[in-house]
């Protein structure tokens, strides 16, 4: 059966995906050993990015591999409602229409968001399909669907009853742009240019003052103390005295607290308990009053006196000017300091004292810590275990309420008569305490990550005891990025143990961060993002998948250059053309068992190499070394199958050995396409179904098993020697400018079988092979080993004198070019500071130069020798 002359992914990809869905290949059978994964649900805020593409590719490689290994695979898909991100996106859209959320009732606004959600859920689904994800769409879930909403309500109520959820007034992170509280993990901290302001605080009743230093002079309006370290001799005399707050006149105590760092600034700290987390803790320890100076828009409120109505930035400028005018400002120092910004909109986050709902995390963390410490849950690579544990040891309570409309509304109804909180899975009719029907539901919604934390079991039907939950929970692996270890991974582990009494997954594979070719993080501001959908459109899904897999080395960020996609599109073309060549030579094919007695050296070699490749790829996939697995099949298919075996047997296809060669080709190609399938599903399905030995679909074909009788170390060694001899002959041709079409004469000191000589003549374009006792004059060394020495005669092909002169100049040029790499490798700063892959790349370039120089110098030596 023939195929088209060129590989066109657009003609085959969606055709096969629709076929797979129709055949229900991605729906688990319910029999055999189980293997389950839940997809990290992408946000419904737009298009997927290259990080998603990598994540999906890795999960699909695992799913397809396990499916072919006979596992009952469930890869469960879904999407996340993404509270802040989605509401922000919708509000941004409304602003282009001249409207805001406040122009609508809550229900009207939620209708708009649901329409948005349904549209983008379908778009994201189509995008995931275009990558080739073998997820079971019949089990697709959404973090706001009714089943998950039921699970969320039950978890909230159960945790409240256990005392794990409580409401309290605490310092929280407030984003005034998003109009909501953020968890600690949703705040990104950056070093930014700022200033340290030194300000005099007069001591009451004395002609003295204490100088404090602060980066936020505007918050002094809410100061309720000055703190110093108890062992700081400079300030011991002030402890217990009263300071007068400049501009405000408030009397505030000078206190001693161990939190204060005597080496920072002046060693005296202004304490603003309502607007700083650490100050809040100091305030609690010393029973200080809490003065809140900001409203929800971070505008100064009535507690700010004459500065009321100013933004934080305006107030800072005005306060500093007033301090200077009244003689309180001592000096201003430039400095860098850490500034917290909203992870969604990059707005500066303001610590505020607010009533919020919290989860008590310490009780939940205990088992989740033990699970990772004892290996019940493992991280790959292992270094992420330490990152996880360090965070868990220091875990703080989680603020779960958000001042949004889009999300899971908190299932709490406060009685408007007695104030009691009625916490219920369903809307209560009356207050459980006083019987009043005057109830009002909490306006806030839950943090998006609250519902996401339940994802592994809520998606399988919990709290009902469903067959899916019984069979597929716990899942086998979670594939995710390091940036959500705290947001999501840790919380899933805690919730899994709390509500399922079982881990949610056995392994956590932390994949690479996708960066640009220079190692920079992809971002809109840099304009260096690569759109996976554009890549698929130009190169095809399979080349993109293979590129991501072959670059996915454990422990390293993935540096992506668009040229890589072209490289692996060429690989796809190579696979296509090799299959086409085989199919064109199968018109009289008859399947027979491959008998070792009828095989030639090249047959034995390729069959043995195939078994080694099967073993290495299987081991690599089992250990999540996707780059190693991809490299193995790439090298085997292109270098060994195409460049050597197919070239070696072309003549034999015209002889009585045709049937043997056909069967070896079909077997090796069949197994190779199966090995390639997890990486390049569309291409392999298109080609595999054309083979005379194919079955129903490569999706459900058996993963190749090692045929021990085909492993032949001796044949591998012998054929490797032939390859090195032929490479040596080709290298000499290249170095002395002898065209590949010109036949050369060779001399051999040693022994070669007739079969080996035929390979050398055919693949090396050799006219004759003469056996000699010593190296002839005017010949170049192609190969030397303990068994054989091979030389190429150059006497009639070149002018020796001019060739030696040319080669010497070439050596000088190569040495000059190599020098820049040598200098880099001698530079301690380069070796210490350059990324590891850049250092290795430099070493490799130097090695290649050294090899080429050594080859040419050997040819020069051979040409100059007289015997």
Swiss-Prot record:
GO terms for CC?
A: cytosol
Q: Which PROSITE patterns match?
A: AA_TRNA_LIGASE_I (PS00178)
GO terms for biological process? valyl-tRNA aminoacylation
Entry EC no(s): 6.1.1.9
Q: Where is this motif: 'HIGH' region?
A: 42-52
Top-level EC class as recorded in UniProt: ligase
Q: Where can the motif 'KMSKS' region be found? A: 521-525
Q: Where in the cell is it found?
A: Cytoplasm
Ranges in a coiled coil: 794-867
What is said about the domains?
Answer: ValRS has two distinct active sites: one for aminoacylation and one for editing. The misactivated threonine is translocated from the active site to the editing site.
Q: Which family does it belong to?
A: Belongs to the class-I aminoacyl-tRNA synthetase family. ValS type 1 subfamily.
Q: Which HAMAP family match?
A: Val_tRNA_synth_type1
* Annotated function: Catalyzes the attachment of valine to tRNA(Val). As ValRS can inadvertently accommodate and process structurally similar amino acids such as threonine, to avoid such errors, it has a 'posttransfer' editing activity that hydrolyzes mischarged Thr-tRNA(Val) in a tRNA-dependent manner.
UniProt name for this protein: Valine--tRNA ligase
Q: Organism classification, top ranks?
A: Bacteria, Thermotogati, Thermotogota, Thermotogae, Thermotogales
């Amino acid at each position: 059966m023939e195929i088209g002359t060129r590989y066109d992914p657009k003609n085959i990809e969606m055709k096969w995906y629709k076929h797979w869905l129709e055949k229900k290949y991605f729906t688990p059978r319910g029999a055999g050993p189980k293997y389950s994964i839940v997809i990290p649900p992408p946000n419904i805020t737009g298009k997927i990015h290259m990080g998603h593409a990598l994540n999906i590719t890795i999960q699909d490689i695992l799913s397809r591999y396990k499916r072919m290994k006979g596992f009952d695979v469930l890869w469960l898909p879904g999407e996340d409602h993404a509270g802040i991100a989605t509401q922000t996106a919708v509000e941004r859209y409304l602003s282009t229409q001249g409207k805001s959320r406040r122009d609508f009732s809550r229900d009207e606004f939620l209708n708009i968001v649901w329409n948005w959600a349904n549209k983008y859920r379908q778009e994201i689904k189509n995008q995931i399909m275009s990558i080739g994800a073998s997820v079971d769409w019949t089990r697709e879930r959404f973090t706001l669907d009714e089943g998950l909403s039921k699970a969320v309500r039950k978890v909230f109520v159960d945790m409240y009853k256990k005392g794990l959820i409580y409401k309290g007034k605490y310092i929280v992170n407030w984003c005034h742009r998003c109009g909501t509280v953020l968890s600690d993990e949703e705040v990104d901290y950056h070093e930014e240019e700022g200033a340290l302001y030194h300000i005099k605080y007069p001591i009451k009743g004395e002609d003295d003052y204490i100088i404090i230093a602060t980066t936020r002079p505007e918050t002094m309006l809410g100061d309720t103390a000055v703190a110093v370290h108890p062992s700081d001799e400079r300030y011991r005399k002030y402890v217990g005295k009263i300071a007068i707050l400049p501009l405000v006149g408030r009397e505030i105590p000078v206190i001693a607290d161990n939190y204060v760092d005597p080496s920072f600034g002046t060693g005296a700290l202004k304490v603003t308990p309502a607007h700083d987390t650490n100050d809040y803790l100091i305030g609690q320890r010393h029973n200080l009053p809490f003065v809140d100076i900001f409203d929800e828009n971070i505008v100064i409120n009535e507690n700010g006196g004459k500065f009321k109505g100013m933004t934080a930035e305006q107030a800072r400028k005005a306060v500093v000017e007033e301090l200077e005018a009244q003689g309180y400002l001592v000096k201003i120092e430039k400095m860098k300091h850490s500034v917290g910004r909203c992870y969604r909109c990059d707005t500066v986050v303001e610590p505020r004292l607010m009533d919020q709902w919290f989860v008590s995390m310490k009780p939940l963390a205990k088992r989740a810590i033990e699970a990772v410490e004892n290996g019940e849950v493992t991280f790959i690579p292992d270094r992420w275990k330490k990152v996880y544990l360090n965070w868990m040891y220091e875990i703080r309570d989680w603020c779960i309420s958000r001042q949004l409309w889009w999300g899971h509304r908190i299932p709490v109804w406060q009685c408007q008569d007695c104030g009691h909180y009625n916490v219920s899975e369903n809307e209560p009719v009356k207050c459980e305490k006083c019987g009043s029907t005057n109830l009002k539901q909490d306006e806030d919604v839950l943090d998006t990550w609250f519902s996401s934390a339940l994802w592994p079991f809520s998606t399988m039907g919990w709290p009902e005891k469903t067959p899916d939950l019984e069979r597929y929970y716990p899942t086998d692996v979670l594939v995710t990025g390091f940036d959500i270890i705290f947001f999501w991974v840790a919380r899933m582990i805690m919730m899994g143990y709390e509500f399922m009494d079982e881990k949610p997954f056995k392994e956590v594979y932390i994949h690479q961060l996708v960066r640009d070719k220079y190692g920079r993080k992809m971002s809109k501001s840099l304009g260096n993002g690569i759109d996976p959908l554009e890549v698929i459109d130009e190169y095809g899904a399979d080349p993109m998948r293979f590129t991501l897999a072959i670059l996915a080395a454990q422990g390293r960020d993935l540096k992506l250059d668009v040229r890589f996609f072209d490289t692996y599109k060429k690989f796809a073309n190579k696979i296509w053309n090799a299959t086409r060549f085989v199919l064109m030579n199968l018109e009289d094919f008859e399947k027979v068992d491959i008998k070792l007695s009828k095989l030639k050296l090249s047959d034995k070699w390729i069959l043995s190499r195939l078994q080694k490749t099967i073993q290495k790829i299987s081991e690599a996939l089992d250990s999540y070394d996707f780059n190693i697995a991809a490299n193995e099949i790439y090298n085997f298919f292109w270098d060994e199958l195409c460049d050597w075996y197919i070239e070696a047997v072309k003549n034999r296809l015209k002889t009585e050995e045709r049937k043997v060669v056909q069967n070896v080709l079909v077997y090796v190609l069949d197994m190779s396409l199966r090995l390639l399938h997890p990486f390049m599903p569309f291409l392999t399905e298109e080609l595999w179904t054309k083979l005379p030995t194919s079955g129903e679909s490569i999706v459900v074909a058996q993963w190749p098993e090692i045929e021990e009788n085909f492993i032949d170390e001796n044949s591998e060694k012998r054929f490797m020697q032939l390859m090195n001899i032929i490479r040596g002959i080709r290298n000499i041709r290249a170095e002395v400018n002898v065209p590949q079409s010109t036949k050369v004469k060779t001399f051999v000191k040693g022994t070669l079988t007739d079969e080996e000589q035929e390979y050398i003549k055919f693949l090396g374009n050799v006219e004759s092979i003469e056996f000699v006792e010593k190296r002839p004059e005017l010949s170049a060394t192609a190969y030397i080993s303990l068994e054989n020495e091979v030389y190429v005669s150059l006497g009639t092909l070149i002018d020796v004198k001019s060739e030696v002169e040319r080669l010497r100049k070439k050596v000088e040029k190569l040495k000059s070019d190599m020098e820049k790499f040598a200098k880099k490798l001698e530079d301690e700063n380069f070796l210490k500071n350059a990324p590891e892959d850049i250092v290795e790349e430099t070493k490799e370039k130097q090695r290649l130069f050294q090899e080429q120089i050594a080859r040419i110098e050997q040819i020069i030596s051979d040409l100059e020798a007289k015997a």
